[in-house]
Regions:
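Active-site/ligand-binding loops adjacent to catalytic centers
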Residues: 1-63, 104-196
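Glycine-rich beta-alpha junction loops
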Residues: 26-30, 70, 94-99
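Phosphate/oxyanion-binding active-site loops and adjacent basic polyanion-contact surfaces
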Residues: 63-71
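Buried hydrophobic packing segments
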Residues: 71-79
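A short acidic (Asp/Glu
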Residues: 75, 101-104
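Non-catalytic interaction/regulatory modules that flank or connect domains
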Residues: 80-87
Length: 196
């Protein structure tokens, strides 16, 4: 999806690839168009009047940026793929808000050349939310995980100077487990700082 920063072209160094079970692709078009629906008066009116969504809920949708929307769509795709139902749960994160993407919102609106209305909202909603499918997903085998892990070699070892030994350590779950206590200590330090 239309993300900005290191994650848009690289496998992040802090991603436990060997513990990843699925890769789910979300198109820029889906995140951009849903962002437009969630952040325009026409889109909000459509959601309230045509989809009967609570106005208070709709007023909170701008809290979802591109990555948050993509994570929600990926969760829907995974739920469909895994045949999950109302007795199951998927937990995801909303990592950003729409306020980070106002220039992108204006570009998306401009792409519709003044033809953006409730009919377009209905088409986009149906295509990108109601019509979410399980295409462009990969359930990872061990070899797939190794292949994705190795994609990071060029970025981190050759370009960023991470030692091969440090890079390779990340293949072992013990590496990630050893960082858990450190992460908890950081959480405590952050809490202490915030209470100052």
């Amino acid at each position: 999806h239309n993300i900005q920063g290191i994650g848009d072209k690289h496998v992040p160094l802090i991603h436990n690839v060997m513990n990843t079970d699925f890769v789910v692709d979300i198109s820029d078009q889906a995140t951009n168009n849903l962002n437009m629906i969630f952040n325009t008066e026409i889109g909000k009116k459509f959601l309230i009047d045509r989809k009967n969504l609570d106005p208070n809920f709709v007023s909170r949708l701008p809290e979802f940026g591109f990555s948050a929307i993509a994570n929600i769509l990926a969760s829907i795709k995974l739920a469909k793929y895994m045949d999950l139902n109302s007795d199951d749960a998927i937990i995801t994160v909303a990592t950003d808000g729409a306020d980070l993407y106002m220039s992108e919102l204006n570009k998306t609106i401009a792409d519709f050349k003044n033809n953006y209305d409730e009919i377009v909202c209905a088409e986009l909603f149906g295509q990108h939310l109601s019509g979410v499918s399980t295409d462009n997903m990969l359930e990872l085998s061990h070899m797939d995980k190794k292949r994705i892990f190795n994609l990071g070699y060029f970025t981190w070892v050759e370009q960023q100077g991470v030692s091969l030994e440090e890079f390779e350590k990340r293949k072992d779950q013990k590496f990630w487990n050893s960082h858990y206590d450190y992460m908890l200590s950081l959480d405590n330090q952050i809490k202490e700082f915030n209470n100052m």
